Amino acid sequence: MHDTATFGLTIVEHLQDNIGAGVKIAERIGFLRRTNFGTTFEVINKPDPNNLAYTSVALPLHTDLPNQEVPPGYQFLHCLANEATGGASLFADGFAMADDLRAEDPEAFYLLCKVSIPFRFHDEDADIQVHKPVITLGDAGEVIEIRYNAHLAGIFDMNYEIMPSYYNAYRAYMAKTRDPRYGLTLKLKAGEMVVFDNRRILHGRNSFDPSTGFRHLHGCYVDRGEFTSRLRLLARTVNIKS
């Protein structure tokens, strides 16, 4: 947990081969975060999906549910099967990309921190939307949250005078999400679970061919407050700074 909080991502190995194994670990840390997709979710190829995650197409790097007032914190994604050709998972540190953008182009960084854009998810059961900036800063000016999801971002509606500059800033950050220097690519194996900070680590996947095998991941979320609370409690009994 300490490494997950520090670096944003860890891999847990040797989970039992059942759908509840990852959830049990998450529940030992804190309460599960319920969303419009339920308390848990299955990432499989579905015939009539309401989310691109439930298809076999490639998913570019993104954070989950930026349309929520407070996006989910830590995601627990347990691989039950990954037999299809393709389907490697992609990860990148959104904080590192933001900090590099700040150093290279302070004006672009400032726009992504100060200007809110619309995010929206809607289907027949929900219509959840919010206006928030891509980058959120803490009291000391440090990056504390990334909201980046091209599929859930709406039409930019800021003042027309800053729109060209904002598009340039957004493209500058997008370019970093496509820069392999920031990326980690791995093909999860059955029995492995990736745990990552959804408000820091962008994730995605390569496309896969469902005719070549089954791909099944099972996931849930635990909010940051629950995660850090458990970490502080554990730190009382071991010599680790929380």
What are the residue ranges of the model-derived segments?
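Active-site environment of non-heme Fe oxygenases that use a 2-His-1-carboxylate facial triad
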Residues: 1-242
